[in-house]
């Protein structure tokens, strides 16, 4: 598996960056997709990029606690201003993909494995 920065993945996929440009140089070591917060808590690994449709404050808290590289929100979902402010404070880049989770995960997988 190749390692890319969050910025490189965002550029290759045309993702919108909503916040935390300072975190865009983090290395992405893999990916994790889930909308169940307890699943992410138990199974996501440091340095992974988290793909989800959840856009509330707890997503940022878990991403920070698990030391994830970034959060990618699917289906063009945009979180509220308070979530963006918390992500900025925690140094967690929040990106937005227009497509559904299945398509987004497939593209990230292809980038990391080809």
What residue spans do the PLM features occupy?
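N-terminal, charge-rich interaction modules
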Residues: 1-21
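Feature captures the catalytic cores and cofactor-binding loops of soluble hydro-lyases/lyases
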Residues: 25-26, 34-49, 53-114
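The Walker A/P-loop phosphate-binding site
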Residues: 31
